[in-house]
Design a protein with these regions (language model features):
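N-terminally biased helix-coil "hinge/interface" segments that flank
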Residues: 1-169
Length: 169
């Protein structure tokens, strides 16, 4: 499937531009040629989360911050990674669910709580919990003004003043 996708993408780009060199982000934050991506798709497995870390690193180094903790809050999960001396920590293996493969990736830790995760207090424990239930994009958090009524992480950030109340989210 990756081979077909990359082939189609290259064909469309070639039809629209001249001499384009397609590169695709790898799980370790580096770039793969189109051919390498087709031949070794396992190296792309965690490229999405690696992209957040790579983008944060690009900005941080130019701003003079070579050491940082990156936090990427999505709708249902939050990814955290450590950058030390301008280099993200790497892992030799990548695990998704119950499957582990020998492919390097940025060392990213994920928790199942994102902006749309619903906060609740279960009767059994009486303790505040966040997720795994999610408000989704529609209706979404109450702050979206689209009919969501259950409290989410995004709503808490609006109430705490971390996100502007007046701005359309």
């Amino acid at each position: 499937r990756v081979q077909k996708y990359v082939h189609n993408l290259k064909s469309k780009l070639d039809a629209k531009t001249k001499n384009v060199k397609l590169h695709i982000l790898r799980s370790d934050g580096g770039l793969a040629s189109a051919r390498s991506a087709e031949d070794f798709p396992v190296n792309l497995l965690m490229s999405g989360p690696a992209g957040g870390v790579t983008g944060a690193l690009w900005v941080a180094v130019r701003a003079g911050f070579p050491n940082l903790l990156t936090v990427d809050v999505g709708g249902t999960s939050t990814d955290v990674a450590l950058i030390n001396n301008g280099q993200p920590r790497l892992r030799r293996e990548t695990t998704v669910g119950d499957v582990t493969v020998r492919a390097s990736s940025v060392d990213i830790r994920t928790v199942g709580a994102g902006g749309g995760s619903i906060a609740h207090v279960p009767e059994l424990t009486g303790a505040l919990r966040v997720g795994p239930q999610s408000a989704g994009a529609d209706p979404g958090p109450a702050a979206y003004g689209k009919g969501g009524v259950e409290p989410t992480v995004t709503d808490a950030n609006v109430v705490l003043g971390y996100l502007p109340e007046q701005q359309k989210l």
